[in-house]
Design a protein with these regions (language model features):
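Active-site glycine-rich loops that stabilize anionic/oxyanionic intermediates
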Residues: 50, 55-61
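Alpha/beta-hydrolase active-site loop
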Residues: 102-123
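Conserved alpha/beta-hydrolase
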Residues: 63-96
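Short alpha-helix in the alpha/beta-hydrolase fold that links the catalytic acid
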Residues: 246, 259-270
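Alpha/beta-hydrolase-fold enzymes
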Residues: 132, 136-224
Length: 337
């Protein structure tokens, strides 16, 4: 189907380096002209006027998938950044092979997203930083050491794929694919050749195993294996989620086999410092037959779903008269407005 909605304006390619030296690449949509400040550092001429929104992708979904949504935000006055986690898309190793490439969900949050947060603070000084997070991108929000700088968060289908939370009618199929077949492929091939299977982008072994072996408690996923954490490190990991004080809107849809109510709220319980709102939407409420886990960011939903995210980014409140029903809400100790 051809997109006829928001035109994906040409963004600027960006390249940064995570704390461990891994290159992270993405794209930025900027308003205004850049100028040289102290020591020749380039800054935006409109710094401090508009927020910058970082889009955290789902597991092994390329950042280019979010171009039209980012262009939509840009058209409404926001600067925007999309990026690929290490091993994916623009941030895939230049050798192209993922065999033996080391990466996990922890790396994506503690190193990659952290690098993007620091980039936003440096390149857009004085501008509020908001985040739109898809699927595991919501987990990534809680992992970054600088996540306290985030002003507002919108999550779509955000969870960490604990198998007990999958939609009942799809649980056996999903268990077979994601928790049996995927880890076998990862171990045998050294990565998951997911593109050949039509699943998603090729996926680093460590990321695939983080998903396949995910426990009821997120931190327990890292009790053993190549990315094992000590007990003290797991305690610090949980505490990092609490550093987020941004109000969070968690959107889920009734036909998302990953983003069930238990899955969404399992993750939300980690964000103890945030005001939380869980908005659940049925496709019929917007006159559509389906939405699912991925389609929220398709431009056919520009007029029906994207304004929900936009309203939250603007005011930290739900869009008046919008679709869906609030199934969970909790006040928090938010220091952002």
């Amino acid at each position: 189907m051809q997109d006829t909605k928001t035109t994906a304006l040409e963004p600027e390619a960006i390249a940064l380096v995570a704390a461990d030296g891994c290159p992270i690449r993405g794209f930025a949509w900027r308003h205004g002209e850049r100028h040289a400040g102290d020591c020749g550092v380039m800054h935006e001429s409109n710094a401090g006027v508009r927020p910058v929104v970082i889009v955290n992708a789902a597991t092994s979904v390329r950042c280019r998938y979010y171009f039209r949504f980012a262009a939509f935000l840009f058209s409404h006055g926001y600067d925007a950044i999309v990026y690929d986690y290490r091993g994916i898309g623009e941030s895939r190793p230049r050798s192209r092979s993922l065999r033996g490439f080391s990466a996990s969900w922890l790396d994506w949050g503690q190193l990659d997203f952290e690098a993007v947060l620091q980039y936003a603070a440096r390149e857009f000084p004085g501008q509020p930083v908001d985040v739109v997070a898809h699927s595991v991108g919501g987990v990534v929000v809680g992992l970054a050491p600088s996540n306290e700088m985030i002003r507002r968060v919108v999550m779509m289908g955000a969870q960490y794929a604990h198998w007990r939370d999958y939609a009942p009618g799809r649980k056996l199929v999903m268990l077979w694919r994601w928790h049996v077949l995927m880890p076998v492929l990862a171990i045998l091939a050294g990565y998951v050749p997911a593109r050949r299977l039509g699943w998603m982008e090729d996926t680093p072994k460590g990321v695939a195993l983080s998903w396949s072996y995910s426990k009821a408690r997120f931190e327990d996923t890292f009790r053993r294996g190549a990315f094992a954490l000590s007990e003290a490190e797991r305690v610090r990991l949980v505490a990092q989620f609490s550093a987020v004080h941004a109000p969070i809107l968690a959107i889920s849809v009734t036909d998302d086999e990953f983003g069930t109510v238990p899955a969404i709220e399992r993750l939300l319980r980690y964000f103890t410092g945030s005001a939380l709102t869980h908005l659940r939407i049925a496709p019929r409420q917007i006159g559509q037959p389906a939405i699912g886990h991925f389609a929220f960011f398709h431009s056919r939903f520009e007029d029906s779903l994207w304004p929900i995210a936009l309203a939250w980014l603007k005011s930290g409140a739900l869009r008046e008269g919008g679709p869906g029903s609030v199934v969970f809400q909790r006040a928090g100790s938010s220091t952002h407005c």
